[in-house]
Curated annotation (Swiss-Prot):
Cofactor: Zn(2+)
Chief location: membrane
Role description: Part of an energy-coupled inorganic carbon pump.
Sequence segments annotated as region (Disordered): 1-20
Keyword Zinc: yes
UniProt protein name: Probable inorganic carbon transporter subunit DabA
Cellular location(s): Cell inner membrane
Designated gene of the protein: dabA
Native source species: Azotobacter vinelandii (strain DJ / ATCC BAA-1303)
Amino acid sequence: MPMASGDESMSARSENPVQSARFDEATVLHELEHYLPKQAPLKDFVHHNTLHAFQDSKFHDAARNASGIFGYNLSLKLDKYRDLYHRGEITPAVLDWVVRRHKGDQSDLWKTKVVAGSFAPPPLPRIGAVRANWKKNLRIDLDSLVHPLLFRILCSYLDQGISMWTFPSGGEGFLCAIRELERHSFTSFFRRERARRLLLEQDCSIAGLLKLLVRDEALFERYLFDQQFAHPGWSGMVTVIEAQPDTLIDSRRIGLRELIVFELLLEIDALDEHFDEQWSPLEAELGGEPLDILAEVPRTELHDALAIWQEALEWSFYDPVLSAIQRQPAESPALPVKSFQGLFCIDDRICSFRRHIESLDPHCETYGTPGFFGVEFYFKPENAKSHTKVCPGSIEPRYLIKETGSRDRLEAEPHFSKHSHDLLGGWVISQTLGFWSAVKLFDSILKPSASPLGASSFRHMDRASSLTILNRSPDDREDGLQIGFSVAEMAERAENLLGSIGLTQDFAPIVYVVGHGASNTNNPHYAAYDCGACSGRPGSVNARVICFMLNHPEVRAILAGKGIEIPAATQFVGALHDTTRDEIAFYDEDSLSPDSRARHRANAAVFDKALALNAKERSRRFELTDSQQSPERVHEAVKARAVSLFEPRPELNHATNALCIVGRRFLSRKLFLDRRSFLNSYDYRVDPDGRFLLGILRAAAPVCGGINLEYFFSHVDNQKLGAGSKLPHNVMGLIGVANGNDGDLRPGLPSQMIEVHHPVRMMIVVEHFPAVVLNTIRQQPATWEWFANEWLNLTVVDPETHELFRFRDGIFEPYRALTERLEVAADLEKLFETQADNLPVLALS
């Protein structure tokens, strides 16, 4: 995201590498909040650009600065790129093209350098350099003395349900709660009196504590950056909760300033204990003028070489895809008879599902659109204490949809009883049910099955429940939100949805709207598997809501007045696709007419067969699944692994995502894209000025771009920007995961989610005229930034000439694909049975 007003850009900081000695607490706190991770608690996990703080810079400049400042590894290793080149995954023609574009007349010299040259290693990162002098000069490791206690206190204070006893917060905030405990407890958090006394002084300030620890005001900013980036997970979580307190169901008040004050007190106490209060401030151990930690990082030949290799890797994938899209024949005439139409999420995991449906029923049509289906609201399940957002995180809804008449009840599980945590109850249960749990555990190894331990997207909403979709009075409100939508509001959203995908005529008798979610067991990152366009929730409620709107007679009358005539016999049916188990559930089937019910039974059989084929295609990535069995048998194995307690990879989620196509289906319908592409339906003919396109790109850039970049950065640096392996993870307070009991929270994605991913930035391909697309992205600064700063690549396909234009340096320039031949997929099923790695783009016969 662009820096907020008042932020200093990297270029501005580079002109003043040495900061003024004056310490501005508010400015430093603002900068810390800007650069710390922005991952929300687990229940609200949504993919985002991990380097959001640098998004106002060009991608390669941002990578250079972020790695030089914070020590992130933001590309593959040089040897890895060279290995990919020698294996043919980076093609020589593409590498030559990229080197010429970067180095011009020096391209021959630089081709030799990148392929076989050596480069000076990068300097050590700036972060941690000042604070490291405690260990270097005074032989004391403050992190090992302070972090275990600090993390336990933070986890206890922010706990959302693991602990039996709640932290006595008093509702006044973190530091107030700590002070209350100090005043009224028999023991203390501190070992010496000085830190305790400082805490109990109500005017305890960051500057005052830093005077004791560091003394030199010119070092204060560097010290705080070093301190907070020694545990960016916890610090980032605190900034998220401070900015969005509603993200916690059990509300807690905490801010970064409070965290820093308490940590500084713990550091003073550790030094007092270690040196018996006879120690000098850090200033005495340092020499020389401090360098501004956020100053521009000098560019080196190694940076240039890595940028060249990265673009060569990306264009080795882009070029054959663009060539294949350009070669697609003109759109076929409309089908005279349509069996059904289906609206699906643009999600890359749905790409293959749509392909299988279309191959089984050539008379159907499928469309892709962001999986909230254009209806933005909060959803409140029956008997729930709070509501949840089910639309893109950047949207602030004004509407609430409530569930009523739910028949679902959570299955009782005696092991979840609170009595198991009591002294007496715990002993009794362990001696009785404990033996039975061992038997169940052993049985689950041999025969995995669904249990209350698992998370299932089908539980998000009861199929038999009712939803308060129609608002009958503007005064019908709850928590400041309007309950339901008026008829006019419903018609507006219905028009926008249908117009954005180009479905404004020739409706089939049944139109399915299929959201998606996931199911998994023993997986803290469950929200990452659901729909990103629904803020990490399943799209089931959204599917039912938009179907209600499109079936409403008054809405249809308004649409007809705007040229969208939906036949009276056409019915919209909501559904949910579980992408882990490849299962589907349909909603409100009892509202179908007799004729539609017969059609629906036939269509449901097509969906079921497509799900089995989809499971078989997915299984080629699963080492322990025999992909050579029949689709039905493979499907059963895939469903079993989804509920296994011991399966760290229930599905590979968005791994290998690299592409988003915004255009008519004929551009991709005859292509095998290996589940790597988001597919957003769009017809330029109904949107000559780009009004609908603006809405599409405004959603696709942060949603698809956030997914792509989180996978990218979690892959290239899984230890700092990812979460490492799932195996040692412990869930901390139900808000995050950490290694062990005393570790920092691990933002980003675990290695099991990204190990098969190829780190390439997403290419968005739009079917429209270049001038229209350029004017469209210029209208929205946040959208423009994604493309102008090259966090996403953008190519336009001229719908009349099929010429390609790539976006670079603020303009579209012609692009001529290097790939001259497209392979044909003779037998896809054979490929699924024998190949586990990425497959090239193929033409479908």
